[in-house]
Amino acid sequence: GKMKFKDCGKGEVTELDITDCSGDFCVIHRGKPLTLEAKFAANQDTTKATIKVLAKVAGTPIQVPGLETDGCKFVKCPIKKGDPIDFKYTTTVPAILPKVKAEVTAELVGDHGVLACGRFGRQVE
């Protein structure tokens, strides 16, 4: 469902949709499939797109382990500046994630810096 999110880039992200979630907060379940879909306008020409997912736990941002980082597996690369991108990322929630509430920052990074960035609240069960 549609998530409320904070843009942490330059306003590129127009929509964020996460399986079985909506509103301010998302509860995700370890070992279960998860689909995150983000719509944004590409702010640069890039040959690559690297996925970075950070969870802020006790005030410290830590990289979420066990996730695919090659964004070109989910969106056609190279990307041209101005292209409308529909980025659909499907994964299984890593079983090693601790059961905590956290603010998550998801970034897609291109050759020239951040392509898109969104923050949202989530809890792992």
UniProtKB/Swiss-Prot annotation:
BP GO terms, sorted: sterol transport
Gene Ontology cellular-component annotations: extracellular region
Protein location: Secreted
Gene Ontology terms, MF aspect: sterol binding
Keywords recorded for this protein, A-Z: Allergen, Secreted
A Pfam family reported for this protein in Swiss-Prot or TrEMBL: E1_DerP2_DerF2
The family this protein is said to belong to: Belongs to the NPC2 family.
PANTHER family: NIEMANN PICK TYPE C2 PROTEIN NPC2-RELATED, NPC INTRACELLULAR CHOLESTEROL TRANSPORTER 2
Protein's recorded name: Mite group 2 allergen Gly d 2.02
Organism whose genome encodes this protein: Glycyphagus domesticus (House itch mite)
Lineage per the UniProt record: Eukaryota, Metazoa, Ecdysozoa, Arthropoda, Chelicerata
